[in-house]
């Protein structure tokens, strides 16, 4: 599963809408990834979609 580095997150929302597993949601003013839903997009995409769309490098990272 992946996680979001909250100190780097700009709360733009790009990742929430791109996640094919609906694993990303807003909690207490920032986005979080539900590890029970995150599949790292294996079998769906070459790399996790949250990583692909996040405008800030190294914000969506392996947990």
Curated annotation (Swiss-Prot):
[4Fe-4S] cluster 1 binds at residues 9, 12, 15, 19. It comes from the Bacteria. GO terms for molecular function: 4 iron, 4 sulfur cluster binding; metal ion binding. InterPro entries: 4Fe4S_Fe-S-bd, 4Fe4S_Fe_S_CS. Binds 2 [4Fe-4S] clusters. PROSITE patterns: 4FE4S_FER_1, 4FE4S_FER_2. Its cofactor is [4Fe-4S] cluster. Residues 2-29 form the 4Fe-4S ferredoxin-type domain. The keyword Transport applies. [4Fe-4S] cluster 2 binds at residues 38, 41, 50, 54. Keywords: 4Fe-4S, Electron transport, Iron, Iron-sulfur, Metal-binding, Repeat, Transport. Ferredoxins are iron-sulfur proteins that transfer electrons in a wide variety of metabolic reactions. This is Ferredoxin-1. The gene is fer1.
């Amino acid at each position: 599963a992946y996680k979001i580095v909250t100190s780097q997150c700009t709360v733009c929302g790009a990742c929430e809408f791109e996640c094919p597993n609906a694993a990303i949601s807003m909690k207490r003013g920032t986005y979080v990834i539900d590890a029970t839903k995150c599949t790292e997009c294996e079998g769906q995409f070459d790399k996790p979609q949250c990583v692909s769309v996040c405008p800030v490098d190294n914000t969506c990272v392996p947990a």
